[in-house]
Amino acid sequence: MFTPKTDRVKKLSELFPKAIEELGVIFEQPARIYIDWQNVLHWQEKLGWHFDLKRLKQLFDSFDTIQSVTIYTGTLEGDQRSGEQIKEIENCGYILSTKPVKLMKISIDVSSIPDDSPAILKSFMKTKFLSKLDIDTVKILNKKLFLLNKQGVTYIEELKCNFDVEMGVDMLLDCERNNTDSFILWSGDSDFASPVMQIKNAGKKAVLFAVSGKVAPELDETGVFIFDIKKIKEFVCFPKEIPQSIKDKIDPIKSQRDSLRSP
């Protein structure tokens, strides 16, 4: 059942009843939510707005069938921003699954390959994109890398922290132990195609929260229901990112006061 956790959630639910109705169907049975936070961060870049951890939890807490919400994210040791985010996740009441972020060194040393070889480029460029490049472009890029090599730069560093295995295992264990009826996955990665199919074959409900059009084909082919997260933007984005027209409706007095203060 939907019971607004805050007054703002209540007012927004009155403005966006269809979104709440759709969520009500998704959460009509006991549900557990599994969030791949790295995926969410990538979505933010595409969407142009951000997920507010506190507001997101308030929305989830408005549905009494949600049993747990687990966020999977890496911890970058010694990084203040990473530490603050970990604390925020815990303070908001999420279940946290974390592990240290690994710093991977990727070679960009082209000294041992022909100038028209994409061998080094393959290590940090997507294959589909690389296949679109002609030989001349590959040569130009390799020349740029060669110049970096002459300056002493022979590798780049990339942060790695993948939780696909942990998330998949947790979902399947919950399914095997009959811990819940509905599995709500926040990710669009192809690695989840197999766990989703196993959950569906077990007679359980699986729902994918993702950005429409940004779901891996393998996952899409499972037939899993996809909920477009853009439908809940106003419920979960930073308050400053709520459109002014919506702010005027949920708090007209404050909006009027703010407009009078504006130069």
List each language-model region with its residue ranges.
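Nuclease catalytic cores that cleave nucleic-acid phosphodiester bonds
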Residues: 98-263
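Polar low-complexity intrinsically disordered regions
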Residues: 1-7, 258-263
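Domain-level signal for Mg2+-assisted phosphodiester chemistry and nucleotide/NA-binding surfaces
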Residues: 2-139, 152, 156, 201, ...
